[in-house]
């Protein structure tokens, strides 16, 4: 039997060896709520005081419908409002894409549809949120997250296809209340004597719907999202910012950004434009939101809010019929092709109906026109003898900004996307080839495909010099796929596997000449995200810029720059 002293010495040596072996791994992880490194209640209280009492102890919105904090009047409000996207954007404990609120373990959810006695799990909703109302409060929150090694989440509206606006055991900076809008008749770039004409500066929390209303009152519009509840300064613009049809006319949102005001990982406020910190400015115009810092204000070009005539050509048919694709769908794409050549842009949509049929439409916008009959005449002339198989309607818009709904519903959807080149789309056989390949994708009930019109100014904006994949400069259309996610247990995982393994290969097959996607509408499990979103050269440059500005990866976004160094939820390096 060993002497007691020797036994204790050996045990202490063993424990020390284990600690030294595990310490590097532990130091490469973010702090979790059950660990000693987690901030004390006193630390959170001090933070709350520094944030002017804007720190929120966060719970899922459905928690008021469950024991032990059941509050029936509050529950009734949540049930009534939960399908309103505009309402959800103002709730730090909710997301527009609501299935990302749930965790990936068994029953890690807090559902409005389950009984009040059922457990309400925190899921992927952060534990605390800094509901910031000033740049200084953003700086305070960033410094706190850095000092305490917390998993930091940036949340604007919750329009996010990859789950980056939420995360378990995380600390959220909620930018929704940074809602200032300032119009400039002739904006001067900060740090230079260069004036660039009309522009608008917007706070991080401004919604496109509100910006369109404000712009409509002053006679301007920006190249922005089709949904009123998308944030104008957040991940949409920082991810590239693809409008439905205005990109063809004025370029992407990122092309039109003049400067960013951003709080970096050190907590400093930086103004980035073409003359100041041009590396960061380049990265922010397509490198992805929540990656290089917290954008608190963005300034972008504005354009006249034109009147327009909107024309819709639609068809419904049997997806099993070859002629539906070779004539009906190809015809709709041919209309878009023909009008694009004339400078008129639009969008194509295809959807599965509950009756088992397929519906499809092409919407085109004739800018600076007011006569409906003139637009309808152009459409019928373009369709020729085939016009009889379609329903054609046109209506005049007083302004482009008026063509956006005030609200958008909650969604449970996954996205995928691919680019179609000019070479394919503009070729004589392009529309038929695309229609034929589209017929192989296989939509389920309620799923749909839509295009965003590129070409035009998107191709001509090479001077804008953004980090998006070089193929954007020679592409005609972005084709996006929207996949419904059931609320049943395990449905999200099944939908993700179907998207990655079955649907995305078929989507990429639309144009075999390239394999390029758009991160804002991309597969959240895209295995080749570096190559398809940015391309190897741009990605390497983005990684270097991130190392320069955020060497400790305080800002990590799923399938974002540097995310390959971290696990699924961004907690531990891999």
From Swiss-Prot:
- Name the keywords, alphabetized: FAD, Flavoprotein, Glycoprotein, Oxidoreductase, Signal
Which InterPro entries does the record cross-reference, listed alphabetically? BBE, FAD-bd_PCMH, FAD-bd_PCMH-like_sf, FAD-bd_PCMH_sub2, FAD-linked_Oxidoreductase, Oxid_FAD_bind_N
Q: What cofactor does this one take?
A: FAD
What is the protein's given name? FAD-linked oxidoreductase penH
- Which residue intervals define the domain FAD-binding PCMH-type in the entry? 121-305
Family to which this protein belongs:
Belongs to the oxygen-dependent FAD-linked oxidoreductase family.
Q: Which GO terms describe its molecular function?
A: FAD binding; oxidoreductase activity
Role noted for this protein = FAD-linked oxidoreductase; part of the gene cluster that mediates the biosynthesis of penigequinolones, potent insecticidal alkaloids that contain a highly modified 10-carbon prenyl group. The first stage is catalyzed by the nonribosomal peptide synthetase penN that condenses anthranilic acid and O-methyl-L-tyrosine to produce 4'-methoxycyclopeptin. 4'-methoxycyclopeptin is then converted to 4'-methoxydehydrocyclopeptin by the ketoglutarate-dependent dioxygenase penM through dehydrogenation to form a double bond between C-alpha and C-beta of the O-methyltyrosine side chain.
Which N-terminal residues, if any, form the signal peptide? 1-25
Catalytic activity as recorded in UniProt: peniprequinolone + A = yaequinolone E + AH2
The EC number of this protein is 1.1.99.-
State the superkingdom: Eukaryota
- Return the broad EC class: oxidoreductase
Pathway it works in? Secondary metabolite biosynthesis; Alkaloid biosynthesis; Mycotoxin biosynthesis
Effect of disrupting the coding gene: Impairs the production of penigequinolone and accumulates the dimethylallyl quinolone intermediate.
Per the UniProt entry, the glycosylated residues are 48, 107, 193, 368, 385
């Amino acid at each position: 039997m060993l002497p007691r002293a020797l036994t204790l010495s050996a045990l202490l040596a063993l424990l020390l060896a284990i600690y030294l072996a595990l310490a590097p791994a532990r130091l490469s992880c973010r702090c979790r709520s059950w660990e000693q490194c987690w901030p004390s209640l006193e630390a959170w209280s001090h933070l709350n005081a520094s944030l002017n009492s804007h720190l929120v102890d966060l719970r899922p919105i459905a928690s008021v419908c469950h024991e032990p904090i059941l509050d029936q009047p509050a529950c009734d409000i949540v049930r009534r409002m939960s399908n309103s996207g505009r309402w959800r954007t103002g709730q730090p404990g909710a997301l527009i894409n609501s299935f990302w609120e749930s965790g990936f373990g068994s029953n890690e959810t807090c559902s409005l549809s389950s009984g009040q006695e059922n457990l309400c799990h925190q899921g992927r909703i952060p534990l605390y949120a800094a509901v910031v109302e000033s740049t200084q409060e953003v700086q305070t929150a960033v410094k706190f997250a850095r000092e305490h090694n917390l998993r930091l989440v940036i949340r604007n509206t919750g329009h996010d296809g990859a789950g980056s606006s939420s995360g378990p055991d995380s600390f959220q900076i909620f930018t929704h209340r940074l809602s200032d809008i300032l119009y400039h008749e002739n904006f001067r770039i900060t740090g230079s004597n260069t004036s660039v004409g009309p522009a608008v500066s917007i706070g991080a929390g401004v919604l496109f719907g509100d910006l369109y209303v404000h712009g409509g009152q002053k006679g301007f519009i920006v190249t922005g999202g089709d949904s009123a509840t998308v944030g104008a300064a957040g991940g949409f613009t920082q991810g590239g910012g693809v409008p439905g049809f205005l990109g063809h006319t004025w370029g992407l949102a990122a092309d039109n950004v003049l400067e960013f005001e951003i709080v970096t990982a050190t907590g400093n406020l930086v103004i980035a434009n073409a003359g100041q910190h041009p590396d960061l400015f380049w990265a922010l115009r397509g490198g992805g939101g929540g990656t290089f810092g917290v954008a608190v204000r963005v300034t972008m070009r504005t354009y006249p809010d034109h009147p327009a005539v909107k024309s819709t050509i639609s068809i419904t048919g049997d997806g099993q019929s070859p002629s539906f694709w070779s004539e009906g769908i190809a015809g709709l794409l041919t209309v878009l092709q023909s009008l694009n050549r004339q400078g008129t842009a639009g969008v194509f949509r295809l959807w599965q109906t509950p009756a088992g049929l397929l519906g499809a439409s092409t919407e085109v916008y004739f800018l600076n026109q007011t006569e409906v009959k003139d637009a309808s005449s152009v459409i019928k002339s373009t369709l020729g003898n085939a016009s009889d198989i379609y329903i054609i309607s046109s209506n005049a818009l007083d302004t482009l900004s008026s063509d956006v709904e005030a609200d958008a519903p909650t969604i449970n959807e996954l996205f995928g996307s691919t680019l179609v080149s000019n070479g394919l789309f503009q070729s004589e056989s392009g529309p038929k080839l695309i229609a034929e390949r589209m017929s192989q994708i296989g939509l389920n009930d309620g799923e749909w495909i839509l295009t965003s019109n590129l070409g035009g100014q998107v191709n001509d904006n090479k001077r804008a010099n953004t980090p998006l994949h070089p193929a954007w400069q020679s592409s005609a259309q972005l084709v996006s796929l929207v996949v419904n996610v059931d609320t049943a247990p395990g449905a999200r995982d099944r939908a993700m596997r179907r998207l990655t393994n079955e649907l995305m290969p078929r989507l990429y097959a639309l144009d075999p000449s390239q394999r390029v996607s758009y991160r804002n509408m991309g597969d959240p499990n895209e295995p080749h995200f570096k190559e398809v979103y940015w391309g190897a050269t741009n990605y390497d440059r983005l990684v270097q810029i991130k190392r320069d500005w955020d060497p400790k990866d305080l800002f990590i976004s799923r399938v974002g720059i540097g995310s390959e160094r971290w696990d699924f939820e961004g907690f531990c390096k891999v």
